[in-house]
């Protein structure tokens, strides 16, 4: 603290975000020192020190940075001219089409990934868990490209990587070894994909993945689109191995997990109770025309849950714009959520509670947290969600983001 013009000022905060309403509460000022929130105090009570950067909040709603827990930042044509949808439908058809065209589009590369990350940042996402393709044609090149892209943003986005075998594991000899190499090289997680429908060997695929996790201490994040009893059986196989190996809570995630909503209520309750007890998490991209994962049941069972954009504007689908708040809206709307407590809970998933998929740190508007702050012209979190309010300002890792500089048209 110091005196300036006869008043006590804070000389630690290098940036002060003035007159905002954290989570829609009372007006406050937020002091930022380096990349951390230093303090949160009633608005107007602590003038900024001379030379401090000031962000005029004008009474806007303040939320923690958005968290994208299931992304594919390596494989978009964002920033390129329109690419017409081609190839066959279904998982196998999309895999084949992607492999036929990705090289001509520069997928993967650092420029591709950086364009995607910049769009995430423009809409307020500051933490990302991204799946990155690992296969015999690419090796680990995609992971290197995504890491380079994140570094180019100089810490604005905190990112963790899932080495993802999009084309299968056992059906492509050598991929399991690539996943092992990725884990040894520092990939935080290793992925899997539909062990029965893709590899035709759920036990073999899962045993291979869990062996890598045991050897390297990495997490597992497994795409599981398989429906009904088949998918539920595979979730049981995953849970059996988590229990057998004593894997710590939060280290194993089931992405999509459509089977959870397909099975009858008693079977679903058993699955969720076991997942909650073992600390196995779930992520969803809130797919349209499908039943959504049951938030109230998952909360009751203690299953931690995150939201993600999936791929955006890519060779799988032209849809998607990278706005995690839009995915949160889609999840809430498709799930018929209208009560304040449910709408606010979805905003918490998209911000504060989603961060555990990327970091062990607290992610909130409190002292000590990384200074990731999003300002929106909204009455409260519920209003921000249902109107998908544009972001008025973004502070990422303590630095004010130049949103105008990031505002490029998707084809440029």
Language-model features: locations:
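Alpha-helical scaffold segments that flank or form the walls of functional sites
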Residues: 77-131, 137-152, 177-184
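C-terminal cap of metal-dependent C-N hydrolases
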Residues: 365-412
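Active-site core of metal-dependent hydrolases
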Residues: 156, 163-172, 184-293, 304, ...
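N-terminal metal-binding scaffold of metallo-dependent hydrolase/deaminase domains
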Residues: 1-49, 381
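Active-site gating loops and adjacent loop-to-helix segments of metal-dependent hydrolytic enzymes
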Residues: 76-109, 234-253, 271, 321-338
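His/Asp/Glu-enriched, well-ordered alpha-helical/loop segment
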Residues: 244-252, 296-378
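Divalent metal-coordination and catalytic microenvironments
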Residues: 20, 35, 59, 70, ...
